[in-house]
Amino acid sequence: MNINVAELLNGNYILLLFVVLALGLCLGKLRLGSIQLGNSIGVLVVSLLLGQQHFSINTDALNLGFMLFIFCVGVEAGPNFFSIFFRDGKNYLMLALVMVGSALVIALGLGKLFGWDIGLTAGMLAGSMTSTPVLVGAGDTLHHSGMESRQLSLALDNLSLGYALTYLIGLVSLIVGARYLPKLQHQDLQTSAQQIARERGLDTDANRKVYLPVIRAYRVGPELVAWTDGKNLRELGIYRQTGCYIERIRRNGILANPDGDAVLQMGDEIALVGYPDAHARLDPSFRNGKEVFDRDLLDMRIVTEEVVVKNHNAVGKRLAQLKLTDHGCFLNRVIRSQIEMPIDDNVVLNKGDVLQVSGDARRVKTIADRIGFISIHSQVTDLLAFCAFFVIGLMIGMITFQFSTFSFGMGNAAGLLFAGIMLGFMRANHPTFGYIPQGALSMVKEFGLMVFMAGVGLSAGSGINNGLGAIGGQMLIAGLIVSLVPVVICFLFGAYVLRMNRALLFGAMMGARTCAPAMEIISDTARSNIPALGYAGTYAIANVLLTLAGTIIVMVWPGLG
């Protein structure tokens, strides 16, 4: 039996789509030195090659892919978007605006200089910024621009062509820039990170290994009684001195949960909760030959929960003001926008931040109720909320504003992005509403993006050879300029106008470019995770601004003549 693969793929859009995805994902795992191609460029290359052979796909699949991707970008940005927009994140907002705005202006200028159409110009901007949200926003706006069919088809083909030709240029140039730009300025990045660490009390905690607290029991002897000198637990400050917290006391056979007025007596058996290294550092009067095994005394359920910051008495407060240790709880991690932050007493909490807290189950529940809620440990997605807000986003995208002879429409990209932000924001405020496990959200987002990339590649593949010959050199030059010049402008603005700490500034610059590989290089150069504070500050707002940049560049292009 002979199987004609070409006819089989041309006759089955679903089969063609998943063949492109599978081959592209395999290609994306290849490395060029220390640089991995990545899923999006792998799928794009495979789809362009197959597109040259005149394979095509139903455009409805392409549209659904970009809609899912943009909606999920909004959901991820939602919990932190408004806090960054309205509060003390104004520096991060301004940095993101400078980065995206300067790239947009430069791309428009280069597009006019080289005589390109809007498709090539927007594609070059998206590729140079390694930003699929720009590509998606521009593609959606082109569909609603009112172009005639032939002109629209050419613009969409050029959009994906420009992206394909400049993506690797943008990625490699930014990674090289992240490695060498810190060395060209007069402040050492490691010194800047250490300065922030000293100012914020991170010298000991920033590199602390995270362990779960353990519970051990000790008998109070004469040495320990002498050590306490008749002071009650509040006056002793056991946690400040030892790093452990007295959770229970057995006295005369009776178990009790002590309060601050309790005084240790000879023969008491005490249960201490703390990290393993804290137990190891205990004064010898606690440890030497005095550890006991008491099943009832040690019968305690130590849990680790992810607590989402929500309540007004926690939002805007510093970590130190929560006084978790005073409530017998231990902080393991601080996560913002899927980025792990340094455990810094001076970090100001935003709504939607996630604190990983360990301690007795009752105490963790109490502290969670005080600052927010315990994240639902469920693998069940609230599909009703997901679908409802998706519909709302599409309806918002249909809104059109008429100004005399000029009409302006929101478009699906802006509508779905706004609806996604609202769903993410409401999820951060209502624990039982709109829950989407991070794994599920990432899968839908990645799948939507890959479907979109496959569609644009298959569509543009037939014209790539002509495009390479005519504009390849121009694209190389333009890609380098749009990738690196906004980074330099952003650095100058942050360093000399905002006067930001260099470690935070470089992290924020990589966040404004939404480039995780470059962020890793900055952290390695600083030998610290301090830059993650800046990265998280700009990342969420940059994703939104980049999507809007794709819309704006298409809208303003006709007016530039």
UniProtKB/Swiss-Prot annotation:
GO biological process: potassium ion transport
Alphabetized GO MF terms: monoatomic cation transmembrane transporter activity
Positions of the RCK C-terminal domain: 200-288, 292-373
Membrane-protein topology: Multi-pass membrane protein
GO cellular component: plasma membrane
InterPro entries xref list: AAE_transporter, RCK_C, RCK_C_sf, Transp_YbjL_put, YidE_YbjL
Keywords noted in UniProt: Cell membrane, Membrane, Repeat, Transmembrane, Transmembrane helix, Transport
Principal localisation: membrane
Membrane-spanning residues: 8-28, 32-52, 66-86, 94-114, 158-178, 383-403, 406-426, 451-471, 475-495, 540-560
Subcellular location: Cell membrane
Membership in a protein family: Belongs to the AAE transporter (TC 2.A.81) family. YbjL subfamily.
NCBIfam families cross-referenced by the UniProt entry: PRK04972.1 (NF003440), YidE_YbjL_dupl (TIGR01625)
PANTHER family, per the entry: K(+)_H(+) ANTIPORTER SUBUNIT KHTT, TRANSPORT PROTEIN YBJL-RELATED
Protein name: Putative transport protein YbjL
Naturally occurring in which organism (per UniProt): Shigella flexneri
Source lineage: Bacteria, Pseudomonadati, Pseudomonadota, Gammaproteobacteria, Enterobacterales
